[in-house]
């Protein structure tokens, strides 16, 4: 396979770092982004990019086009999570969540699409989440941001189909990455007597599942397959088998049963 010019956001750690390394090892020319200056990862060229800043995004894409002449694959991986009750989240917390996880994806796509349209080819891989299929308690705005990515990607795939541009969604379950330790916790939730106990029980379960989750190379391997395939599937679920099967069951399981199962799993009582 001809080496691809690939840009992956959020490549300084976790999924992004491992996936960038794996793609580079396969012979692709890989650029990674991070919000802060970061050393190159092997042959992966790191760029300082704030995905919430359209000017920063556009400058990075223009630099790659200037150096390589094209953009073959964009992987929107940059993301963050805020834990807490929906009612108590501040406007600043909600904006931070949506700006990074959703509008960051929008900014990146808007920057690369003119070049992909001109070339009449390209591939955009948006990292969503199983939390983008079902609302996770005390991760509500994270789920909302991923639901937004899902809807955006569905519409985008239709709009860019005439230009032979593929849009794909990857829905990870729980993986053992630095995401757990980097989660932002809303202080107001822990201080509220009505929510505190329920929140702490659920958070303990969430963090345990993440720490016992799959190795991130499993996700990296799935992304590498999508990059390699001419006609990849629109959606790919990756993670612990139980989580993948549960997410798939939403399409046929009655809503009240799904809600009941989630309450039991996350100790909502």
From Swiss-Prot:
<feature type="active site">
    <location>
        <position position="146"/>
    </location>
</feature>
<feature type="active site" description="Nucleophile; for lipase activity">
    <location>
        <position position="12"/>
    </location>
</feature>
<comment type="similarity">
    <text>Belongs to the short-chain dehydrogenases/reductases (SDR) family.</text>
</comment>
<dbReference type="GO" id="GO:0070402">
    <property type="term" value="F:NADPH binding"/>
</dbReference>
<dbReference type="InterPro" id="IPR051911">
    <property type="entry name" value="SDR_oxidoreductase"/>
</dbReference>
<keyword id="KW-0521">NADP</keyword>
<feature type="active site" description="Proton acceptor">
    <location>
        <position position="142"/>
    </location>
</feature>
<feature type="binding site">
    <location>
        <position position="13"/>
    </location>
    <ligand>
        <name>NADPH</name>
    </ligand>
</feature>
<feature type="binding site">
    <location>
        <position position="10"/>
    </location>
    <ligand>
        <name>NADPH</name>
    </ligand>
</feature>
<dbReference type="GO" id="GO:0047560">
    <property type="term" value="F:3-dehydrosphinganine reductase activity"/>
</dbReference>
<feature type="short sequence motif" description="GXSXG">
    <location>
        <begin position="10"/>
        <end position="14"/>
    </location>
</feature>
<protein>
    <recommendedName>
        <fullName>3-ketodihydrosphingosine reductase</fullName>
        <ecNumber>1.1.1.102</ecNumber>
    </recommendedName>
</protein>
<feature type="binding site">
    <location>
        <begin position="142"/>
        <end position="146"/>
    </location>
    <ligand>
        <name>NADPH</name>
    </ligand>
</feature>
<feature type="binding site">
    <location>
        <position position="50"/>
    </location>
    <ligand>
        <name>NADPH</name>
    </ligand>
</feature>
<dbReference type="InterPro" id="IPR036291">
    <property type="entry name" value="NAD(P)-bd_dom_sf"/>
</dbReference>
<feature type="binding site">
    <location>
        <position position="36"/>
    </location>
    <ligand>
        <name>NADPH</name>
    </ligand>
</feature>
<feature type="active site" description="Lowers pKa of active site Tyr">
    <location>
        <position position="146"/>
    </location>
</feature>
<comment type="function">
    <text>Catalyzes the reduction of 3'-oxosphinganine (3-ketodihydrosphingosine/KDS) to sphinganine (dihydrosphingosine/DHS), the second step of de novo sphingolipid biosynthesis.</text>
</comment>
<dbReference type="Pfam" id="PF00106">
    <property type="entry name" value="adh_short"/>
</dbReference>
<dbReference type="GO" id="GO:0030148">
    <property type="term" value="P:sphingolipid biosynthetic process"/>
</dbReference>
<keyword id="KW-0443">Lipid metabolism</keyword>
<keyword id="KW-0560">Oxidoreductase</keyword>
<feature type="binding site">
    <location>
        <position position="146"/>
    </location>
    <ligand>
        <name>NADP(+)</name>
    </ligand>
</feature>
<feature type="binding site">
    <location>
        <position position="12"/>
    </location>
    <ligand>
        <name>NADPH</name>
    </ligand>
</feature>
<keyword id="KW-0746">Sphingolipid metabolism</keyword>
<feature type="binding site">
    <location>
        <position position="142"/>
    </location>
    <ligand>
        <name>NADP(+)</name>
    </ligand>
</feature>
<keyword id="KW-0547">Nucleotide-binding</keyword>
<feature type="binding site">
    <location>
        <position position="14"/>
    </location>
    <ligand>
        <name>NADPH</name>
    </ligand>
</feature>
<feature type="active site" description="Proton donor">
    <location>
        <position position="128"/>
    </location>
</feature>
<dbReference type="InterPro" id="IPR002347">
    <property type="entry name" value="SDR_fam"/>
</dbReference>
<dbReference type="GO" id="GO:0016020">
    <property type="term" value="C:membrane"/>
</dbReference>
<dbReference type="InterPro" id="IPR020904">
    <property type="entry name" value="Sc_DH/Rdtase_CS"/>
</dbReference>
<dbReference type="GO" id="GO:0006666">
    <property type="term" value="P:3-keto-sphinganine metabolic process"/>
</dbReference>
<comment type="pathway">
    <text>Lipid metabolism; sphingolipid metabolism.</text>
</comment>
<feature type="binding site">
    <location>
        <begin position="175"/>
        <end position="177"/>
    </location>
    <ligand>
        <name>NADPH</name>
    </ligand>
</feature>
